[in-house]
């Protein structure tokens, strides 16, 4: 297979991996944690996975501590937690 063909195959596999939803059994446990702004007083837009609504939602993060259910972008949240 040519290098162009290998690059195309690699690109398609990467795209498939990005677009394949996470099943609930593969979802990390931290996706079930509530949004946690932490004790600091920053005003940073962040996203968390809301397990009841099964969506990623925005919240205000204080900038320190909190928990692992905290993402800089909604796309990162969806890739990690959304089914």
Swiss-Prot record:
Compartmental location:
Secreted
Question: What is the top-level taxon of the source organism?
Answer: Eukaryota
**InterPro entries per the UniProt record, alphabetical:** Kunitz_BPTI, Kunitz_BPTI_sf, Prtase_inh_Kunz-CS, TFPI/VKTCI-like
- Any one cellular-component term (Gene Ontology): extracellular region
| GO MF term set | serine-type endopeptidase inhibitor activity
Q: Which parts pass through the membrane?
A: none
Under CDD domains, the record lists: Kunitz_textilinin-like
Q: List keywords of the entry alphabetically.
A: Disulfide bond, Protease inhibitor, Secreted, Serine protease inhibitor, Signal
UniProt keyword Iron present? no
| Record carries keyword Glycosyltransferase | no
Site positions for Reactive bond for trypsin? 41-42
Q: Name one Pfam family in it.
A: Kunitz_BPTI
Renumbered to this chain, the signal peptide range is 1-24
Task: Domain (BPTI/Kunitz inhibitor): give its ranges.
Answer: 31-81
Which cysteines in this chain are paired by disulphide bridges? 31-81, 40-64, 56-77
What is this protein's function per UniProt?
Serine protease inhibitor.
Record protein name field: Tigerin-4
Which organism is the protein's source? Notechis scutatus scutatus (Mainland tiger snake)
